[in-house]
């Protein structure tokens, strides 16, 4: 309902920037760094929740009555806070606390990191402290 809105601003349709097919013309692998609760920092190509590996795939979560499906292309940081909720920072600076879906809860299957040199590391979700995502070769904006 309306109580879920922080702000409503009406704008002309020609000023509305919606995601379109061409925004994903050249899909990329997820690339980033996983910091673990025991202090390790692991960088490489990532597979999130063991099934999302490309920037056009979606991070699913809920906040109150609002459901989010955010392309990983727009996700910059992910930080599990407890078994039910995760903090997420988007490329535009927006911060969300999401829960209610497997991607952002203790039911997440963990992260695979394909490191330079061929080493593959699996990190359980409960061991993840923080994840940073960026386009390969370019760290966060």
Regions found by a protein language model. Name each.
Residues 1-141:
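Compositionally biased alpha-helical segments
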